[in-house]
Structure formats: structure tokens, C-alpha cells
Amino acid sequence: MKGMQTTSNVGRKFNEDGSVRFFPGNTIISKVLEDNEIYSVIAGISKEFQAADQGRSYQFLPLASLHMTIIQGVCHEDRKKQLWSRYLPLDLELEKVDEFFEEKFKEVKSLPETRMIYDYIDMSNKNILVRFVPENQQAAENLKKYRDDVSDKLGVRFPDHDSYGFHISVAYQLWEMTEAEKEKMQKACERISRSLEKNRPSFSLRQPE
């Protein structure tokens, strides 16, 4: 938005006009499709926040792109040893990395039935994220084994591997807010959070890809 101070999300994943910036990379995700029980919940959250923001500060993600990252892959702009496959050179073309990952991913065992449950809404880092945690101990074990298997096969183990926070992204903040705008969004967050905390929605993860 011309004349307004941008956030760190501009120049990385987004352009200043709100359009998506070319950001090549790969990651393992579980898609959230319309037939998933959590889809309508996330759609409702997005709609309420959009009403509060009124197109001022956030770029809301299209519902067709909803997903939960299961384990991070690599991206072209972050060619650092700790964020790259230990099996591959840092200067390898991303297309070659993709080919390697696609072949190795075939060796990963399927994720068993695993349910996630609502935890909280996180607006702390210039984003709107809906945080989830495994619904029970078995779900937590399923995810740990799966992530460790993917990590071993692809050679990727980020510094936060054992503490990664599962979430579904709703929006990215592109422009800084006034104090009045911050207060309005905070009130919307509190209102939405109260509603979600009453029933703590849960859902089954679609097989990662």
C-alpha cells in the first residue's frame, strides 16, 4: 500500500503491491481441502479477520492453498548448511534438489491416521497463524516418527526440528499498522479465540506430499 511502511514479509514472499513473489523451494505439506472438517473453521477465521483488517495491512491466503507444513524442505534463498540437505552441495540447482527429494520421498513410510487439535491463534510474528498440536500421545509419536523418517531420507534437519510448531497460515502482514488498527485486530483475535477455545476443533491430517 503506497506510502505505508512495509514489514519484513515484503521482499521475501510478497511484493509491495501484495502480489506473491517468486520464492522457489520445496516442503512436505498436508493439504487442507474442502472436505476436511477444519476447512470451514479456517475459512471462518479468515473471513472474520478480513472484516477487521479491511484490506489495510494483511494479505490473506486463498482458501485453495490451505495446508499444514509437516516438515520444512529447502528454498533457493536460504542456501545455508543448517537449512540444506546434508547429502547435497549448497550450490546445486534447485531442479536437481527437487529430483533428488522426489526419489527419496518415495522411501518414506506413510503417516498413520493422525489428528491435530486447536491450540491458539498466533499473531506474534507479522503473520496470522492458527496453531495446532497433536490430539494425543499417539498422534505426537506418529508425527515424530514421520518427521524423523523424512529428515533421514532427505537429509534435512532444521535447528527447530524437535520443537517445530504446527500451524495453518491464514495471512501475512505486509504493512505496519497504526495503534488503532492494532487494537482492532487484537480485539478480533480475542473474540475469535474465545469461540475456538469453547470447542477446540480438531481434524485428521491428509497424507503428506
Please give the residue ranges for each predicted region.
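Histidine-dependent nucleotide/RNA phosphoesterase domain, centered on the 2H-phosphoesterase fold
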Residues: 1-209
